[in-house]
Amino acid sequence: MRVLVNNPRAQYDYYLLTGYCAGLVLKGSEVKSLALGQGSLKEAYVFIDKHEVYIKDFSISPYAFSGEFNHPFKRVKKLLLNRNEIKQITARQKQEGLSIIPLKVFFKNGKIKMEIWLAKPKKKFDKREAIKSKTIQRELRQQYGSP
């Protein structure tokens, strides 16, 4: 499994609860560009429309060698999930008010997959506590050596 793109802010902004592995419907130039690591999940979000799952604002840079047959920079892409998984996600999202967050894009058996998570947003004070605990742990490691 080779990770192509990560979402750096996901674990900082959200409590990650349940993860799913979804396939992506992509064009050829998008696949080649992602293989070079030219993608960003910073502003991307997942939504469900008519029992189908999509990702919006997942930016993939244009592939340099495709010329005029290049893909649009930010287009809505379809995610491939099992029908039962979509029902589970929809039910939990409606009941608990959770968000669907893309965490990473990776190669698995020659196919590009995306790891999505049901997540609960963190409050501002939760983020401060997380930063504080990380700095304390870092200082302890520096003082006493790594565990």
Curated annotation (Swiss-Prot):
UniProt-listed InterPro entries: SmpB, SsrA-bd_prot, SsrA-bd_prot_CS
Keywords in alphabetical order: Cytoplasm, RNA-binding
SUPFAM superfamilies in the cross-refs: Small protein B (SmpB)
Alphabetized Pfam families for the sequence: SmpB
Alphabetized HAMAP family for the sequence: SmpB
Protein function: Required for rescue of stalled ribosomes mediated by trans-translation. Binds to transfer-messenger RNA (tmRNA), required for stable association of tmRNA with ribosomes. tmRNA and SmpB together mimic tRNA shape, replacing the anticodon stem-loop with SmpB. tmRNA is encoded by the ssrA gene; the 2 termini fold to resemble tRNA(Ala) and it encodes a 'tag peptide', a short internal open reading frame. During trans-translation Ala-aminoacylated tmRNA acts like a tRNA, entering the A-site of stalled ribosomes, displacing the stalled mRNA.
Protein name: SsrA-binding protein
Originating species: Mycoplasma pneumoniae (strain ATCC 29342 / M129 / Subtype 1)
